[in-house]
């Protein structure tokens, strides 16, 4: 794998940027960050975080993790609420990785090989620009409420077209790795 230079600077970029947006995720953000930091990878990554003016302890928890992982965690802690769309967009603009993974602050990964598996797939299948995986919806006690939901007419496994992506963007949003179009 090669690591390339970000077009906007002379700094060497990481291989994958993980975008995490938060708003009042105090109960969940530790599990979210731990699930990223547990990844067993042989490439560099960064965590680009955008906290949208949380009124609970989310920002303080993010600062705590950033102090322990200053070379990985790059937070923006807003003093004014801008909404999820702008928050996530601004995070995308800060990404330096060849690939971008997306994880909301109240979600978490359970497989420590998740990023490696998806990156290996994309690196070895150059005709693909994104990949996703199954997910489960859990309650506050991590009890599974619902296994992966695909919806009527949505293929469970297989190749997705741009029409699938546009129609089922939520599923792809919470469980994907995509090649960066920003670099």
Model-derived regions, located:
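Acidic helix N-cap motif at the loop->helix transition within catalytic regions
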Residues: 28-30, 56-64, 86
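Conserved donor NDP-sugar-binding/catalytic core segment of glycosyltransferases
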Residues: 113-147
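A conserved acidic beta->alpha catalytic loop
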Residues: 51-60, 80, 104
């Amino acid at each position: 794998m090669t690591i390339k230079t970000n077009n906007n600077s002379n700094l060497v970029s990481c291989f994958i940027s993980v975008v995490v947006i938060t708003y009042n995720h105090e109960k969940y953000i530790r599990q979210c960050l731990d699930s990223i930091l547990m990844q067993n990878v042989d490439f560099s990554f960064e965590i680009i975080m955008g906290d949208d003016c949380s009124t609970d302890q989310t920002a303080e928890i993010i600062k705590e993790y950033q102090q322990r992982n200053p070379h990985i965690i790059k937070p923006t802690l807003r003093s004014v609420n801008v909404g999820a769309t702008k928050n996530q967009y601004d995070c995308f603009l800060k990404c330096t990785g060849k690939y971008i993974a997306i994880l909301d602050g109240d979600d978490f990964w359970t497989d420590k090989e998740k990023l490696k598996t998806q990156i290996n797939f994309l690196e070895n299948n150059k005709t693909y620009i994104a990949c996703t995986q199954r997910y489960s919806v859990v309650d506050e006690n991590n009890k599974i409420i619902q296994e992966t939901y695909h919806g009527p007419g949505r293929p469970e496994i297989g190749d997705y077209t741009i029409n699938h992506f546009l129609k089922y963007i939520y599923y792809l949003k919470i469980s994907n790795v995509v090649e960066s179009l920003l670099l």
